[in-house]
């Protein structure tokens, strides 16, 4: 089983399916990656363990980005 540890790993997983995400803001990229993962899983292309692992990585990264925004006073 593939173990995904960071955002780069999730990007590489999506790349295997021809999905490249770059919207210009890291938080937006993470949100779109989560949507794409959902679509791949619903289509039966991802194993549940890999899907959940990737979603957990994205959740962690998204929370980190939100924390940075709060600290900088942005929203």
Where on the chain are the PLM-derived regions?
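N-terminal acidic leader/helix
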Residues: 1-27
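Charged low-complexity stretches with an acidic bias
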Residues: 1-6, 55-75
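Amphipathic alpha-helical interaction surfaces
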Residues: 16, 20, 39, 43, ...
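Short, conserved alpha-helical segments within structured domains
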Residues: 26-33, 54
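Amphipathic alpha-helical segments that form the core helices of the histone-fold
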Residues: 30-42
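Short, charged early-sequence alpha-helical segments and their helix-coil boundaries
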Residues: 43-59
């Amino acid at each position: 089983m593939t173990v995904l540890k960071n955002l780069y790993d999730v990007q590489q997983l999506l790349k295997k399916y021809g999905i490249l995400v770059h919207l210009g803001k890291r938080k937006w990229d993470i949100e779109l990656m989560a949507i794409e993962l959902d679509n791949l899983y619903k289509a039966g292309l991802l194993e549940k363990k890999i899907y959940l692992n990737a979603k957990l990585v994205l959740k962690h990264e998204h929370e980190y980005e939100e924390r940075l925004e709060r600290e900088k006073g942005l929203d």
